[in-house]
């Protein structure tokens, strides 16, 4: 019974995150040093600022990053990723946490973190892990996957001296709330580069106190298409992990775990609605300002979408609790 429950929970997680199994382990795990050196020498990303379009993340690296991000609670955490490049795809094979000081708005890497980073990569090579550092990750607890002004500056610096390099952002709070990993992979454009108009990107809820930071820098980077993969070896490791942790799915509730997050969402939504109402009220006294009205209506539409998202997540959490109550607390003894 326990094994069956574990299997169902694992399958649900894999389907939610579109996890793909690699048939041949050697196909993606084999490290071709000569090929990687040729790519580094050619530097095709210098000719095309939008060269890298895809990012593949191994299931093991994904779990390590999400568990690390979750352990930080409301504080941001930071880590490094190891991997390689295959054409227009950046492949993340592994990840490790960095000993950094985190706050609710940023992570501060000190000298000890850089020493730890260098020692880890060197020791990894000594045990046969030949992949190089391919990027860094950090968490945005509760406010979505995007790059702030500090993140953009950090990534620009990394791309200047450590190419190829990718920035990954994880939101552990929304991951628990939605039941699906909330992760984004990004690369920045060089200073002074104006990207072509790519049309509207996928909508995501941004808290009111973060909107300005998001809007100012959103044209300085682009998102890569992220997919996840696992090998037969990963499958064995995942089974061991799920056998240990699957009970947490039944014993925990997103309504209780994310109570502070949900409350914060409601407060943020009320502020957005008040702001939209005030702007619409001012617009009614200002003649000939159709652009102003359109912007106000656009903000109101976004606030409506945010309210729908919060409501759906709350309903899903409530439905989950009702189902568990029916299963375990109302057993018919007749």
UniProtKB/Swiss-Prot annotation:
Q: Does the keyword tRNA processing apply?
A: no
Q: What's its top-level EC category?
A: hydrolase
Q: Which cysteines are joined by disulfide bonds?
A: none
Which UniProt key words apply to this protein?
A: Cytoplasm, Cytoplasmic vesicle, Hydrolase, Metal-binding, Metalloprotease, Nucleus, Protease, Signalosome, Synapse, Zinc
Where would I find the MPN domain in this sequence?
55-192
Would you tell me the Gene Ontology cellular component terms?
COP9 signalosome; cytosol; nucleus; perinuclear region of cytoplasm; synaptic vesicle
The Gene Ontology biological process terms listed for this entry are: negative regulation of apoptotic process; positive regulation of DNA-binding transcription factor activity; proteolysis
Question: In which compartments does the protein localize?
Answer: Cytoplasm, Cytosol; Nucleus; Cytoplasm, Perinuclear region; Cytoplasmic vesicle, Secretory vesicle, Synaptic vesicle
> Which GO molecular function annotation, any one, does this entry have?
metal ion binding
Enzyme Commission no = 3.4.-.-
Q: Does the keyword Lipid metabolism apply?
A: no
Which family does this protein fall into? Belongs to the peptidase M67A family. CSN5 subfamily.
Quaternary structure, per UniProt, is:
Component of the CSN complex, probably composed of cops1, cops2, cops3, cops4, cops5, cops6, cops7, cops8 and cops9.
Q: What does the record's free text say on domains? A: The JAMM motif is essential for the protease activity of the CSN complex resulting in deneddylation of cullins. It constitutes the catalytic center of the complex.
Q: So what does this one do?
A: Probable protease subunit of the COP9 signalosome complex (CSN), a complex involved in various cellular and developmental processes. The CSN complex is an essential regulator of the ubiquitin (Ubl) conjugation pathway by mediating the deneddylation of the cullin subunits of E3 ligase complexes, leading to modify the Ubl ligase activity. In the complex, it probably acts as the catalytic center that mediates the cleavage of nedd8 from cullins. It however has no metalloprotease activity by itself and requires the other subunits of the CSN complex.
User: What name has this protein been given in UniProt?
Assistant: COP9 signalosome complex subunit 5
Give the gene name.
Answer: cops5
């Amino acid at each position: 019974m326990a094994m069956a429950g574990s299997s169902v929970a694992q399958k649900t997680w894999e389907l939610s995150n579109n996890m793909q199994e690699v048939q041949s382990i050697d196909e993606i795990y084999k490290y071709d040093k000569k090929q990687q050196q040729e790519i580094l020498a050619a530097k095709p990303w210098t000719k095309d600022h939008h060269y890298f379009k895809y990012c593949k993340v191994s299931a093991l690296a994904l779990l390590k990053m999400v568990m690390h991000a979750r352990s930080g609670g409301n504080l941001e955490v930071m880590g490094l990723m190891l991997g390689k490049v295959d054409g227009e795809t950046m492949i993340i094979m592994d990840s490790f946490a960095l000993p950094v000081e985190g706050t609710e708005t940023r992570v501060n890497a000190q000298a000890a973190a850089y020493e730890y980073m260098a020692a880890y990569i060197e020791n990894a090579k000594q045990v046969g892990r030949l992949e190089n550092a391919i990027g860094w990750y950090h968490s945005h607890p509760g406010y979505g996957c995007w790059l702030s002004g500090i993140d953009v500056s950090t990534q620009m610096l990394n791309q200047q001296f450590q190419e190829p390099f990718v920035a990954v952002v994880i939101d552990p709070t929304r991951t628990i709330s939605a039941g699906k990993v909330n992760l984004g992979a990004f690369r920045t454009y060089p200073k002074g580069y104006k990207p072509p108009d790519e049309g509207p990107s996928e909508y995501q809820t941004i808290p009111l106190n973060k909107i300005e930071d998001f809007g100012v820098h959103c044209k300085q980077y682009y998102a890569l298409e992220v997919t996840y993969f696992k090998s037969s070896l990963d499958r064995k490791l995942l089974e061991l992990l799920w056998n240990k942790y699957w009970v947490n799915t039944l014993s925990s509730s997103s309504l209780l775990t994310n109570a502070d997050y949900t409350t914060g969402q409601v407060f943020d939504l009320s502020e957005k609605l008040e702001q939209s109402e005030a702007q619409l009220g001012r617009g009614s006294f200002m003649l000939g300002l159709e652009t102003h009205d359109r912007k106000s209506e656009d903000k109101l539409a976004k606030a409506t979408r945010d309210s729908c998202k919060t409501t759906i997540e709350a309903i899903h959490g409530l439905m989950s609790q009702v189902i568990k109550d029916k299963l375990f607390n109302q057993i018919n003894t007749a």
